[in-house]
Regions:
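Fe-S-dependent hydro-lyases/dehydratases of central metabolism
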Residues: 1-527
Protein backbone atom coordinates (compact mmCIF):
# COMPACT_ATOMS: atom_id res chain seq x y z
CA UNK A 1 0.00 0.00 0.00
CA UNK A 2 1.26 3.48 -0.84
CA UNK A 3 1.70 6.12 1.84
CA UNK A 4 -1.42 8.26 2.27
CA UNK A 5 -1.29 11.70 0.74
CA UNK A 6 -2.74 13.18 3.93
CA UNK A 7 0.44 13.33 6.00
CA UNK A 8 -1.49 14.43 9.10
CA UNK A 9 -2.41 10.75 9.44
CA UNK A 10 1.18 10.06 10.50
CA UNK A 11 0.62 11.99 13.73
CA UNK A 12 -2.63 10.08 14.30
CA UNK A 13 -0.78 6.80 13.89
CA UNK A 14 1.91 7.90 16.34
CA UNK A 15 -0.77 8.75 18.90
CA UNK A 16 -2.32 5.33 18.43
CA UNK A 17 -5.63 6.75 17.26
CA UNK A 18 -8.16 4.67 15.36
CA UNK A 19 -8.27 5.75 11.72
CA UNK A 20 -11.03 4.75 9.29
CA UNK A 21 -9.87 3.10 6.07
CA UNK A 22 -11.62 5.84 4.12
CA UNK A 23 -9.00 8.29 5.40
CA UNK A 24 -6.26 6.33 3.64
CA UNK A 25 -8.26 6.32 0.41
CA UNK A 26 -8.74 10.08 0.14
CA UNK A 27 -7.57 11.45 -3.19
CA UNK A 28 -7.18 8.01 -4.76
CA UNK A 29 -8.93 6.74 -7.88
CA UNK A 30 -12.00 4.53 -7.58
CA UNK A 31 -10.17 1.21 -7.96
CA UNK A 32 -7.38 2.12 -5.53
CA UNK A 33 -9.98 3.16 -2.94
CA UNK A 34 -11.68 -0.21 -3.20
CA UNK A 35 -8.38 -2.10 -3.03
CA UNK A 36 -7.60 -0.27 0.22
CA UNK A 37 -11.08 -0.87 1.63
CA UNK A 38 -10.90 -4.59 0.85
CA UNK A 39 -7.57 -4.83 2.65
CA UNK A 40 -5.32 -5.44 -0.32
CA UNK A 41 -5.16 -6.47 -3.95
CA UNK A 42 -5.80 -10.19 -3.41
CA UNK A 43 -9.06 -9.86 -1.44
CA UNK A 44 -10.16 -7.19 -3.91
CA UNK A 45 -9.43 -9.46 -6.88
CA UNK A 46 -11.22 -12.34 -5.17
CA UNK A 47 -14.29 -10.15 -4.76
CA UNK A 48 -13.91 -8.94 -8.35
CA UNK A 49 -13.87 -12.51 -9.67
CA UNK A 50 -16.99 -13.24 -7.61
CA UNK A 51 -18.77 -10.25 -9.10
CA UNK A 52 -18.97 -8.43 -5.77
CA UNK A 53 -17.20 -5.22 -6.76
CA UNK A 54 -18.06 -2.58 -9.29
CA UNK A 55 -15.97 0.20 -10.76
CA UNK A 56 -16.69 2.55 -13.60
CA UNK A 57 -15.56 1.25 -16.99
CA UNK A 58 -13.34 3.29 -19.29
CA UNK A 59 -15.64 5.36 -21.51
CA UNK A 60 -13.13 7.53 -23.36
CA UNK A 61 -14.44 8.45 -26.80
CA UNK A 62 -12.37 7.82 -29.96
CA UNK A 63 -9.40 10.19 -30.13
CA UNK A 64 -6.01 10.30 -31.85
CA UNK A 65 -3.80 7.95 -29.85
CA UNK A 66 -0.12 7.21 -29.39
CA UNK A 67 1.12 3.70 -30.13
CA UNK A 68 1.13 2.85 -26.42
CA UNK A 69 -2.42 4.14 -25.96
CA UNK A 70 -3.56 1.99 -28.89
CA UNK A 71 -2.05 -1.09 -27.28
CA UNK A 72 -3.64 -0.31 -23.92
CA UNK A 73 -7.02 0.26 -25.58
CA UNK A 74 -6.83 -3.21 -27.13
CA UNK A 75 -6.04 -4.78 -23.75
CA UNK A 76 -8.13 -2.95 -21.13
CA UNK A 77 -10.83 -5.06 -19.48
CA UNK A 78 -14.19 -3.59 -20.49
CA UNK A 79 -17.58 -3.29 -18.79
CA UNK A 80 -18.67 -6.73 -20.01
CA UNK A 81 -15.57 -8.43 -18.64
CA UNK A 82 -14.14 -8.80 -22.11
CA UNK A 83 -11.03 -7.15 -23.47
CA UNK A 84 -10.78 -3.95 -25.49
CA UNK A 85 -12.23 -0.45 -25.31
CA UNK A 86 -12.76 2.22 -27.96
CA UNK A 87 -9.98 4.46 -26.74
CA UNK A 88 -7.98 5.45 -23.68
CA UNK A 89 -6.44 8.67 -22.44
CA UNK A 90 -3.82 9.39 -19.78
CA UNK A 91 -5.34 8.93 -16.33
CA UNK A 92 -7.84 6.22 -17.33
CA UNK A 93 -7.66 3.51 -14.67
CA UNK A 94 -8.57 -0.14 -14.98
CA UNK A 95 -7.18 -3.60 -15.50
CA UNK A 96 -5.15 -4.53 -18.55
CA UNK A 97 -5.06 -8.09 -19.80
CA UNK A 98 -1.45 -9.22 -20.13
CA UNK A 99 -0.01 -11.50 -22.78
CA UNK A 100 3.18 -12.60 -21.02
CA UNK A 101 4.24 -12.65 -17.37
CA UNK A 102 7.75 -13.41 -16.18
CA UNK A 103 9.71 -13.34 -12.96
CA UNK A 104 13.18 -14.25 -11.74
CA UNK A 105 14.59 -15.90 -8.64
CA UNK A 106 14.48 -12.71 -6.55
CA UNK A 107 10.68 -12.48 -6.81
CA UNK A 108 9.19 -15.83 -7.85
CA UNK A 109 9.76 -17.53 -4.46
CA UNK A 110 7.90 -14.90 -2.43
CA UNK A 111 5.09 -14.73 -4.98
CA UNK A 112 4.89 -18.53 -4.89
CA UNK A 113 4.61 -18.51 -1.08
CA UNK A 114 1.77 -15.97 -1.32
CA UNK A 115 0.04 -18.06 -3.99
CA UNK A 116 0.26 -21.30 -2.04
CA UNK A 117 -0.92 -19.59 1.16
CA UNK A 118 -3.87 -17.67 -0.26
CA UNK A 119 -4.89 -19.81 -3.24
CA UNK A 120 -3.61 -23.27 -2.34
CA UNK A 121 -0.66 -25.51 -3.09
CA UNK A 122 -1.09 -27.27 -6.42
CA UNK A 123 -3.99 -25.08 -7.58
CA UNK A 124 -3.21 -24.32 -11.26
CA UNK A 125 -2.21 -20.80 -12.23
CA UNK A 126 -4.14 -18.98 -14.94
CA UNK A 127 -2.70 -19.89 -18.38
CA UNK A 128 0.66 -21.33 -17.33
CA UNK A 129 2.02 -21.29 -20.90
CA UNK A 130 2.18 -17.49 -20.83
CA UNK A 131 4.25 -17.45 -17.62
CA UNK A 132 8.05 -17.76 -17.74
CA UNK A 133 10.53 -18.09 -14.89
CA UNK A 134 14.24 -17.27 -14.98
CA UNK A 135 17.28 -18.13 -12.89
CA UNK A 136 19.70 -15.41 -14.02
CA UNK A 137 20.47 -12.89 -11.28
CA UNK A 138 22.46 -15.00 -8.83
CA UNK A 139 24.12 -17.60 -11.06
CA UNK A 140 27.66 -16.37 -10.37
CA UNK A 141 27.13 -15.08 -6.83
CA UNK A 142 29.43 -17.66 -5.23
CA UNK A 143 32.40 -16.35 -7.24
CA UNK A 144 32.32 -12.89 -5.66
CA UNK A 145 30.61 -13.33 -2.29
CA UNK A 146 32.92 -12.46 0.59
CA UNK A 147 33.63 -14.90 3.40
CA UNK A 148 31.90 -12.52 5.79
CA UNK A 149 28.68 -12.63 3.78
CA UNK A 150 28.93 -16.39 3.40
CA UNK A 151 29.07 -16.68 7.18
CA UNK A 152 25.92 -14.54 7.32
CA UNK A 153 24.21 -17.25 5.28
CA UNK A 154 23.59 -15.17 2.15
CA UNK A 155 24.75 -17.90 -0.22
CA UNK A 156 22.47 -20.40 1.51
CA UNK A 157 19.56 -17.98 1.18
CA UNK A 158 20.28 -17.56 -2.53
CA UNK A 159 20.25 -21.34 -2.92
CA UNK A 160 16.89 -21.50 -1.15
CA UNK A 161 15.49 -18.97 -3.62
CA UNK A 162 16.70 -21.15 -6.46
CA UNK A 163 15.05 -24.30 -5.13
CA UNK A 164 11.75 -22.62 -4.23
CA UNK A 165 11.40 -21.25 -7.75
CA UNK A 166 12.43 -24.60 -9.20
CA UNK A 167 9.89 -26.53 -7.11
CA UNK A 168 7.03 -24.15 -7.88
CA UNK A 169 7.82 -24.24 -11.60
CA UNK A 170 7.78 -28.05 -11.54
CA UNK A 171 4.52 -28.22 -9.54
CA UNK A 172 2.80 -25.79 -11.92
CA UNK A 173 4.35 -26.97 -15.18
CA UNK A 174 5.78 -23.50 -15.84
CA UNK A 175 8.83 -23.16 -18.08
CA UNK A 176 11.95 -22.27 -16.12
CA UNK A 177 14.98 -20.93 -17.96
CA UNK A 178 17.63 -21.99 -15.49
CA UNK A 179 21.30 -22.82 -15.19
CA UNK A 180 23.24 -24.79 -17.76
CA UNK A 181 23.79 -28.46 -17.11
CA UNK A 182 27.26 -28.81 -18.65
CA UNK A 183 28.94 -25.58 -17.51
CA UNK A 184 28.41 -22.63 -15.21
CA UNK A 185 26.02 -19.98 -16.43
CA UNK A 186 22.36 -19.41 -17.23
CA UNK A 187 20.30 -20.03 -20.33
CA UNK A 188 19.99 -16.28 -20.49
CA UNK A 189 19.07 -13.05 -18.76
CA UNK A 190 15.29 -12.74 -18.57
CA UNK A 191 15.12 -9.59 -20.71
CA UNK A 192 17.43 -11.03 -23.36
CA UNK A 193 15.42 -14.24 -23.71
CA UNK A 194 12.09 -12.40 -23.68
CA UNK A 195 13.25 -10.26 -26.61
CA UNK A 196 14.81 -13.11 -28.57
CA UNK A 197 12.07 -15.68 -28.03
CA UNK A 198 8.74 -14.48 -26.70
CA UNK A 199 7.70 -10.81 -26.91
CA UNK A 200 5.61 -9.76 -29.91
CA UNK A 201 4.46 -6.42 -31.33
CA UNK A 202 1.25 -5.12 -29.80
CA UNK A 203 1.44 -7.16 -26.61
CA UNK A 204 1.22 -6.05 -23.00
CA UNK A 205 3.92 -7.91 -21.06
CA UNK A 206 4.85 -7.64 -17.39
CA UNK A 207 7.90 -8.78 -15.46
CA UNK A 208 9.38 -8.67 -11.99
CA UNK A 209 12.19 -6.30 -12.91
CA UNK A 210 12.61 -2.60 -13.59
CA UNK A 211 14.22 -3.30 -16.97
CA UNK A 212 11.18 -5.15 -18.31
CA UNK A 213 10.74 -2.28 -20.88
CA UNK A 214 13.69 -3.87 -22.74
CA UNK A 215 11.26 -5.67 -25.07
CA UNK A 216 9.56 -2.40 -25.98
CA UNK A 217 12.00 -2.49 -28.89
CA UNK A 218 9.63 -5.07 -30.36
CA UNK A 219 6.78 -2.56 -30.34
CA UNK A 220 4.96 -3.78 -27.25
CA UNK A 221 4.08 -2.32 -23.86
CA UNK A 222 6.23 -3.94 -21.17
CA UNK A 223 6.62 -2.77 -17.60
CA UNK A 224 7.90 -3.96 -14.26
CA UNK A 225 5.61 -5.05 -11.43
CA UNK A 226 6.16 -6.01 -7.80
CA UNK A 227 5.64 -9.29 -6.00
CA UNK A 228 1.99 -8.62 -5.10
CA UNK A 229 1.10 -7.89 -8.72
CA UNK A 230 3.08 -10.92 -9.93
CA UNK A 231 1.19 -13.23 -7.58
CA UNK A 232 -2.19 -11.71 -8.45
CA UNK A 233 -1.49 -11.87 -12.19
CA UNK A 234 -1.07 -15.64 -11.87
CA UNK A 235 -4.72 -15.71 -10.79
CA UNK A 236 -6.35 -13.03 -12.94
CA UNK A 237 -4.02 -12.68 -15.96
CA UNK A 238 -4.43 -8.93 -15.69
CA UNK A 239 -2.86 -6.08 -13.72
CA UNK A 240 -4.17 -2.77 -12.46
CA UNK A 241 -2.88 0.22 -14.42
CA UNK A 242 -3.42 3.94 -14.81
CA UNK A 243 -2.79 4.84 -18.44
CA UNK A 244 0.35 7.02 -18.42
CA UNK A 245 1.09 10.05 -20.52
CA UNK A 246 3.82 9.80 -23.16
CA UNK A 247 7.04 11.70 -23.77
CA UNK A 248 8.10 11.52 -27.40
CA UNK A 249 11.86 11.51 -28.00
CA UNK A 250 12.64 12.35 -31.62
CA UNK A 251 16.24 11.75 -32.73
CA UNK A 252 16.89 13.05 -36.22
CA UNK A 253 19.94 13.06 -38.46
CA UNK A 254 22.66 10.50 -39.04
CA UNK A 255 24.86 9.31 -36.21
CA UNK A 256 28.63 9.13 -36.40
CA UNK A 257 30.23 5.69 -36.94
CA UNK A 258 31.43 5.50 -33.33
CA UNK A 259 28.11 6.58 -31.80
CA UNK A 260 25.56 4.01 -30.62
CA UNK A 261 22.16 3.81 -28.97
CA UNK A 262 23.94 3.89 -25.60
CA UNK A 263 25.33 7.32 -26.45
CA UNK A 264 21.82 8.48 -27.38
CA UNK A 265 20.37 7.37 -24.05
CA UNK A 266 23.25 8.81 -22.00
CA UNK A 267 22.74 12.14 -23.78
CA UNK A 268 19.02 11.97 -23.03
CA UNK A 269 19.59 11.11 -19.37
CA UNK A 270 21.82 14.18 -18.99
CA UNK A 271 19.07 16.58 -20.12
CA UNK A 272 17.52 18.90 -17.54
CA UNK A 273 13.99 17.72 -18.39
CA UNK A 274 14.91 14.15 -17.50
CA UNK A 275 17.20 14.94 -14.56
CA UNK A 276 14.48 17.07 -12.96
CA UNK A 277 12.10 14.10 -12.95
CA UNK A 278 9.58 15.47 -15.43
CA UNK A 279 9.55 12.21 -17.41
CA UNK A 280 8.81 10.07 -14.35
CA UNK A 281 6.07 7.46 -14.85
CA UNK A 282 5.67 8.39 -18.52
CA UNK A 283 5.88 6.18 -21.58
CA UNK A 284 9.12 7.09 -23.36
CA UNK A 285 8.38 6.77 -27.08
CA UNK A 286 11.47 6.88 -29.30
CA UNK A 287 11.12 8.04 -32.90
CA UNK A 288 12.94 9.83 -35.72
CA UNK A 289 15.17 8.62 -38.54
CA UNK A 290 18.15 7.99 -36.26
CA UNK A 291 16.00 5.59 -34.21
CA UNK A 292 14.47 3.99 -37.29
CA UNK A 293 17.99 3.27 -38.54
CA UNK A 294 18.82 1.29 -35.39
CA UNK A 295 18.48 -2.48 -35.24
CA UNK A 296 16.04 -4.10 -32.81
CA UNK A 297 19.01 -4.97 -30.57
CA UNK A 298 20.10 -1.34 -30.44
CA UNK A 299 16.56 -0.09 -29.92
CA UNK A 300 16.40 -2.39 -26.89
CA UNK A 301 19.21 -0.36 -25.32
CA UNK A 302 16.95 2.70 -25.51
CA UNK A 303 13.81 0.98 -24.21
CA UNK A 304 15.75 -0.88 -21.50
CA UNK A 305 17.10 2.36 -20.07
CA UNK A 306 13.70 4.00 -19.91
CA UNK A 307 14.06 2.58 -16.39
CA UNK A 308 16.94 4.97 -15.68
CA UNK A 309 14.78 7.85 -16.91
CA UNK A 310 12.17 6.73 -14.38
CA UNK A 311 9.70 6.07 -17.15
CA UNK A 312 6.73 3.73 -17.00
CA UNK A 313 8.12 1.98 -20.07
CA UNK A 314 9.93 2.61 -23.34
CA UNK A 315 8.69 1.78 -26.81
CA UNK A 316 9.60 2.08 -30.48
CA UNK A 317 6.73 1.71 -32.95
CA UNK A 318 7.33 -1.55 -34.84
CA UNK A 319 8.41 -1.41 -38.48
CA UNK A 320 10.18 -3.50 -41.12
CA UNK A 321 13.20 -3.92 -38.80
CA UNK A 322 10.91 -5.76 -36.37
CA UNK A 323 9.41 -7.84 -39.17
CA UNK A 324 12.91 -8.83 -40.30
CA UNK A 325 13.85 -9.73 -36.70
CA UNK A 326 10.83 -12.01 -36.37
CA UNK A 327 11.49 -13.66 -39.73
CA UNK A 328 15.27 -14.06 -39.48
CA UNK A 329 15.72 -14.79 -35.77
CA UNK A 330 12.48 -16.58 -34.94
CA UNK A 331 11.60 -18.14 -38.26
CA UNK A 332 8.17 -16.49 -38.37
CA UNK A 333 6.25 -16.28 -41.62
CA UNK A 334 6.69 -12.79 -43.08
CA UNK A 335 2.99 -12.26 -43.72
CA UNK A 336 2.21 -13.16 -40.10
CA UNK A 337 4.89 -10.77 -38.82
CA UNK A 338 3.56 -8.02 -41.07
CA UNK A 339 0.05 -8.49 -39.66
CA UNK A 340 1.34 -8.13 -36.11
CA UNK A 341 2.66 -4.59 -36.70
CA UNK A 342 -0.37 -3.36 -38.64
CA UNK A 343 -1.79 -0.18 -37.13
CA UNK A 344 0.86 0.03 -34.42
CA UNK A 345 1.89 3.61 -34.96
CA UNK A 346 1.19 6.91 -33.26
CA UNK A 347 -1.37 9.05 -35.01
CA UNK A 348 -0.25 12.50 -36.23
CA UNK A 349 -2.58 14.35 -33.85
CA UNK A 350 -1.82 12.20 -30.79
CA UNK A 351 -1.13 14.23 -27.66
CA UNK A 352 2.12 14.04 -25.70
CA UNK A 353 3.09 15.30 -22.28
CA UNK A 354 6.29 16.61 -23.85
CA UNK A 355 8.38 16.25 -27.00
CA UNK A 356 12.19 16.12 -26.85
CA UNK A 357 14.17 16.67 -30.05
CA UNK A 358 17.78 15.57 -30.49
CA UNK A 359 20.09 15.73 -33.48
CA UNK A 360 22.16 12.56 -33.82
CA UNK A 361 24.90 14.51 -35.57
CA UNK A 362 25.46 16.57 -32.39
CA UNK A 363 26.05 13.48 -30.24
CA UNK A 364 29.57 12.14 -29.76
CA UNK A 365 30.68 9.11 -27.70
CA UNK A 366 29.46 9.61 -24.13
CA UNK A 367 30.24 8.44 -20.64
CA UNK A 368 28.23 8.79 -17.45
CA UNK A 369 30.66 9.67 -14.68
CA UNK A 370 30.48 7.72 -11.40
CA UNK A 371 27.41 7.97 -9.21
CA UNK A 372 24.48 8.29 -11.60
CA UNK A 373 23.55 7.39 -15.21
CA UNK A 374 22.48 11.02 -15.62
CA UNK A 375 26.05 12.30 -15.21
CA UNK A 376 26.60 12.27 -18.95
CA UNK A 377 29.39 14.05 -20.77
CA UNK A 378 31.33 13.58 -23.99
CA UNK A 379 34.43 11.41 -23.68
CA UNK A 380 36.40 14.21 -25.32
CA UNK A 381 35.39 16.53 -22.46
CA UNK A 382 37.02 14.46 -19.72
CA UNK A 383 39.62 16.83 -18.31
CA UNK A 384 42.43 14.32 -17.90
CA UNK A 385 43.04 10.73 -19.04
CA UNK A 386 41.14 8.31 -16.78
CA UNK A 387 43.07 5.04 -16.30
CA UNK A 388 40.90 1.97 -15.78
CA UNK A 389 41.45 -1.42 -14.16
CA UNK A 390 38.24 -3.16 -15.21
CA UNK A 391 36.21 -2.99 -18.42
CA UNK A 392 32.91 -4.84 -18.51
CA UNK A 393 30.73 -5.60 -21.51
CA UNK A 394 27.53 -7.52 -20.90
CA UNK A 395 24.17 -7.47 -19.06
CA UNK A 396 20.73 -7.19 -20.61
CA UNK A 397 21.64 -3.75 -21.92
CA UNK A 398 24.89 -4.69 -23.62
CA UNK A 399 25.02 -8.47 -23.99
CA UNK A 400 23.02 -8.74 -27.22
CA UNK A 401 24.18 -9.92 -30.66
CA UNK A 402 24.92 -6.45 -31.94
CA UNK A 403 26.79 -5.55 -28.76
CA UNK A 404 29.03 -8.55 -29.43
CA UNK A 405 29.53 -7.26 -32.98
CA UNK A 406 30.86 -4.04 -31.45
CA UNK A 407 33.23 -5.68 -28.97
CA UNK A 408 34.53 -7.93 -31.75
CA UNK A 409 34.94 -5.03 -34.20
CA UNK A 410 37.10 -3.04 -31.80
CA UNK A 411 39.19 -6.01 -30.69
CA UNK A 412 39.71 -7.30 -34.24
CA UNK A 413 40.80 -3.81 -35.24
CA UNK A 414 43.24 -3.76 -32.32
CA UNK A 415 44.69 -7.14 -33.26
CA UNK A 416 45.34 -5.89 -36.79
CA UNK A 417 47.40 -3.09 -35.26
CA UNK A 418 49.31 -5.53 -33.07
CA UNK A 419 47.45 -4.47 -29.93
CA UNK A 420 45.36 -6.32 -27.36
CA UNK A 421 43.70 -5.60 -24.01
CA UNK A 422 46.08 -3.48 -21.91
CA UNK A 423 48.10 -5.35 -19.30
CA UNK A 424 46.66 -3.09 -16.60
CA UNK A 425 43.05 -3.96 -17.51
CA UNK A 426 40.78 -6.95 -17.07
CA UNK A 427 38.16 -6.91 -19.83
CA UNK A 428 35.12 -9.11 -19.14
CA UNK A 429 32.65 -9.92 -21.92
CA UNK A 430 29.48 -11.66 -20.77
CA UNK A 431 26.80 -12.99 -23.11
CA UNK A 432 23.20 -12.02 -22.50
CA UNK A 433 21.94 -15.43 -23.57
CA UNK A 434 22.94 -18.76 -25.02
CA UNK A 435 21.49 -17.61 -28.33
CA UNK A 436 23.99 -14.75 -28.31
CA UNK A 437 26.81 -17.11 -27.33
CA UNK A 438 25.91 -19.39 -30.24
CA UNK A 439 25.89 -16.36 -32.52
CA UNK A 440 29.41 -15.47 -31.36
CA UNK A 441 30.58 -19.02 -32.07
CA UNK A 442 29.18 -18.84 -35.61
CA UNK A 443 30.80 -15.45 -36.19
CA UNK A 444 34.18 -16.58 -34.87
CA UNK A 445 34.13 -13.97 -32.11
CA UNK A 446 35.27 -16.30 -29.32
CA UNK A 447 38.66 -16.63 -30.96
CA UNK A 448 38.89 -12.86 -31.43
CA UNK A 449 38.03 -12.28 -27.77
CA UNK A 450 40.58 -14.88 -26.66
CA UNK A 451 43.41 -13.57 -28.84
CA UNK A 452 42.77 -10.03 -27.67
CA UNK A 453 42.95 -11.05 -24.00
CA UNK A 454 39.31 -10.62 -23.00
CA UNK A 455 37.75 -12.85 -20.33
CA UNK A 456 34.56 -14.46 -21.63
CA UNK A 457 31.71 -15.30 -19.23
CA UNK A 458 28.57 -17.39 -19.75
CA UNK A 459 25.16 -15.64 -19.48
CA UNK A 460 23.94 -14.10 -16.24
CA UNK A 461 23.28 -10.72 -14.64
CA UNK A 462 26.54 -10.96 -12.74
CA UNK A 463 28.60 -7.85 -12.15
CA UNK A 464 25.73 -5.47 -12.92
CA UNK A 465 24.09 -6.41 -9.61
CA UNK A 466 27.36 -7.01 -7.72
CA UNK A 467 26.91 -10.76 -8.14
CA UNK A 468 29.52 -11.96 -10.61
CA UNK A 469 32.96 -11.51 -12.19
CA UNK A 470 33.73 -7.94 -13.19
CA UNK A 471 32.79 -6.29 -9.90
CA UNK A 472 35.19 -3.83 -8.32
CA UNK A 473 36.81 -4.69 -5.00
CA UNK A 474 38.31 -1.36 -3.86
CA UNK A 475 36.89 2.16 -3.56
CA UNK A 476 39.72 3.59 -5.69
CA UNK A 477 39.27 1.05 -8.50
CA UNK A 478 38.02 2.59 -11.76
CA UNK A 479 35.66 0.63 -13.98
CA UNK A 480 34.15 1.35 -17.37
CA UNK A 481 31.03 -0.67 -18.10
CA UNK A 482 28.39 -0.99 -20.80
CA UNK A 483 25.71 -1.81 -18.20
CA UNK A 484 22.82 0.50 -17.35
CA UNK A 485 23.47 1.74 -13.79
CA UNK A 486 26.45 3.11 -11.90
CA UNK A 487 24.91 4.09 -8.58
CA UNK A 488 27.34 3.91 -5.64
CA UNK A 489 27.86 0.28 -4.61
CA UNK A 490 25.84 -1.08 -7.52
CA UNK A 491 28.73 -3.21 -8.80
CA UNK A 492 31.19 -3.05 -5.94
CA UNK A 493 32.84 -0.17 -4.08
CA UNK A 494 34.76 1.22 -7.08
CA UNK A 495 34.17 4.22 -9.34
CA UNK A 496 32.15 3.20 -12.42
CA UNK A 497 31.80 5.04 -15.72
CA UNK A 498 29.04 3.97 -18.10
CA UNK A 499 29.68 3.90 -21.83
CA UNK A 500 28.80 2.17 -25.09
CA UNK A 501 30.21 -1.22 -26.10
CA UNK A 502 32.50 0.54 -28.59
CA UNK A 503 33.88 2.92 -25.97
CA UNK A 504 34.25 0.15 -23.36
CA UNK A 505 36.22 -2.07 -25.73
CA UNK A 506 38.41 0.78 -27.01
CA UNK A 507 39.17 1.82 -23.43
CA UNK A 508 40.07 -1.77 -22.50
CA UNK A 509 42.70 -1.75 -25.24
CA UNK A 510 44.02 1.73 -24.45
CA UNK A 511 44.08 1.27 -20.68
CA UNK A 512 42.21 4.53 -20.16
CA UNK A 513 38.84 5.93 -21.21
CA UNK A 514 38.87 6.83 -24.89
CA UNK A 515 36.62 6.96 -27.93
CA UNK A 516 36.72 4.21 -30.51
CA UNK A 517 38.20 5.52 -33.74
CA UNK A 518 37.02 3.40 -36.68
CA UNK A 519 39.80 2.16 -38.96
CA UNK A 520 38.52 3.99 -42.04
CA UNK A 521 38.62 7.32 -40.18
CA UNK A 522 42.20 6.73 -39.05
CA UNK A 523 43.20 5.87 -42.59
CA UNK A 524 41.56 9.04 -43.90
CA UNK A 525 43.47 11.16 -41.35
CA UNK A 526 46.75 9.42 -42.20
CA UNK A 527 46.21 9.91 -45.91
Amino acid sequence: MRMPRNFSLIDCIRRGEEIPLSAFAQGEDEITRQVIEYGGLFPFNLARMQGKVFFSPITTKPRPMTVSEKIFARHMVNADGGVGVEAVKPGDTGFTRVDLRFSHEYVTPMAAIFYEHFVGKGVPVNDRDTIKFFRDHLTFLDEVLSEEKRKMGLLDLATQLKFKQQDFAKDQGIQLHCELKDRKGSEGICHSVMLETYALPGQVDVGSDSHTPHVGAMGCIAFGIGTTDVFNSWITKDVRVKVPGSVRVVIRGKRKPNVTAKDFILALLAMDYVRSGKALAKVIEYAGEAVEELSVDERATLTNMAAEIGGFTGIVAPDEKVVAFLVERRGMDRAQAQMLIEGLNSEPDAQYSHVIKLNAEDIAPMVATPGDPGNGKFVRDLNTPVPIEIAYGGTCTAGKNEDMDMYARVLADALKQGKRVADSVKFYIQFGSQETRDYCVRQGYLEVFKQAGAIVIEPGCGACINAGPGVSTRPDQIVISAQNRNFPGRSGPGQMYLASPLTVAASAVAGYITEYEPAQEREAVTA
